[in-house]
Amino acid sequence: MRLPIFLDTDPGIDDAVAIAAAIFAPELDLQLMTTVAGNVSVEKTTRNALQLLHFWNAEIPLAQGAAVPLVRAPRDAASVHGESGMAGYDFVEHNRKPLGIPAFLAIRDALMRAPEPVTLVAIGPLTNIALLLSQCPECKPYIRRLVIMGGSAGRGNCTPNAEFNIAADPEAAACVFRSGIEIVMCGLDVTNQAILTPDYLATLPELNRTGKMLHALFSHYRSGSMQSGLRMHDLCAIAWLVRPDLFTLKPCFVAVETQGEFTSGTTVVDIDGCLGKPANVKVALDLDVKGFQQWVAEVLALAS
């Protein structure tokens, strides 16, 4: 039986690969997509997500979500993903539109209609998920678990300690981590290992139309990294759903720093139990890289 999932995303180049896997992995049933401001503005992430759904002819409803963090000023990653978030490929024009309600309400409505609890997957800032949990707490029993790409037990990627998706809205992440729902965190500890090799990247244009499109996106903004390999951060959250055997997880207490002058957005991961608090997150700490690479090749070969 396919696993029903809702995907909250901020495409973004590596989001495009994760979305492809969510659509084409035969084990998954992607039923709803929502967008959030993150890599670029929410207007741009929504446009990019609709372009991808049209590219794959995927009839999946999409709702536009939060334009700004819960409390603080927005930040983006346009320096990595470009001003549009997904330039480099000539997508065909379309007339698709998002649903007419905010993302967190679309998630609420879909959860309440679902015949069984649904797995939420969040690969951008956690603003929409925090709004859902704070404004619609009656939804919690209908959430099977939340799988996120975000955080780190060690180094950060936008500050010395903080990973971008958490740092973009620390208050939202703190709300989510305190919520009591089951959480699996695929942070930089594993995503920095999730590298597609230059040899494999070179084969993408001949793989299928998806490979050609992804290669164009990668080449446009990450041409230098193409020679050393590309990290597939967001894809790890999808990979865990399908191949949890590739990941080493440890239950830990995790809190989000929201006050520190130098540490705001840091996920404080108590690996050794120093704080004596009960674990609230299953933290991915290691990855079978070869197995991951093989799985990626298999799922992208289906993405035609």
Curated annotation (Swiss-Prot):
* Species whose genome carries this gene: Escherichia coli O9:H4 (strain HS)
Q: NCBIfam families from the xrefs?
A: PRK10768.1
* Function of the protein: Hydrolyzes both purine and pyrimidine ribonucleosides with a broad-substrate specificity.
- Cited InterPro entries: I/U_nuclsd_hydro_CS, Inosine/uridine_hydrolase_dom, IUNH, Nucleosid_hydro_RihC_nonspecif, Ribo_hydro-like
Going by the entry's taxonomy, the superkingdom of the source organism is recorded as Bacteria
**GO BP, one example?**
purine nucleoside catabolic process
Tell me what gene encodes this.
Answer: rihC
Active-site residues, record numbering mapped to chain: H233
Note whether Hydrolase occurs among the keywords: yes
Listed GO cellular component terms? cytosol
Enzyme Commission designation = 3.2.-.-
Q: List, in alphabetical order, the Gene Ontology terms for molecular function in this entry.
A: purine nucleosidase activity; uridine nucleosidase activity
Protein's name in the database: Non-specific ribonucleoside hydrolase RihC
Q: What class of enzyme is it?
A: hydrolase
Keywords attached to this entry: Glycosidase, Hydrolase
Q: Which family does it belong to?
A: Belongs to the IUNH family. RihC subfamily.
